Regions:
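Short gly/ser/thr-rich secondary-structure transition/capping motifs
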Residues: 4-5, 38, 58-61
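Conserved catalytic-core segment of NTP-binding enzymes
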Residues: 42-132
């Protein structure tokens, strides 16, 4: 997409709640799985080049094709962690895989965090409203503020 096309397309897809712009989840997981790392990187670069966003937050899981290539493009990677044995085993496996694939730069960018749990009984925009102004929302805003201060 060209810059004008991207801005128009994004404008039609972006939803906003309390000064937080976000793209709603995809309708089909296959859309995520079939997107290559190169396509993700190209899209993100266009957003950086042609939008006014200061921060882009990605919620990535293992269903993203070529995840490690995409993670290599990130300046900071926040990994929410839990202390239970299953979660710890998954983290160890992930870190081991990064080491085997010689992705030390990705490992170095990871910041393990323990964000507060968010619970809401509402759905849709009510849920997003609750999320933005919850303890979790405060936690994320503070993380972003510290990142800006630290450069």
């Amino acid at each position: 997409l060209g810059s004008d096309q991207l801005v128009t397309k994004m404008g039609s897809m972006v939803q906003s709640i309390n000064n937080l712009d976000y793209l709603p989840p995809v309708l089909s997981m296959e859309d995520i799985q079939s997107t290559t790392a190169e396509e993700w990187i190209r899209l993100l670069q266009q957003i950086i080049d042609y939008s006014n966003y200061d921060v882009i937050i990605l919620d990535l899981g293992d269903s993203v094709s070529q995840l490690y290539q995409l993670l290599e493009q990130c300046t900071r990677i926040y990994m929410p962690i839990r202390a239970d044995p299953v979660s710890q085993a998954k983290i160890q496996q992930f870190e081991h895989t990064l080491q085997v694939w010689e992705k030390q730069a990705v490992l170095d960018r990871i910041r393990k965090i323990k964000p507060p749990y968010h619970r809401s009984t509402r759905s849709g925009t009510g849920y997003m409203d609750d999320l933005v102004w919850s303890e979790l929302g405060d936690y994320v805003r503070e993380m972003i503020r510290k990142e800006w201060e630290d450069g």
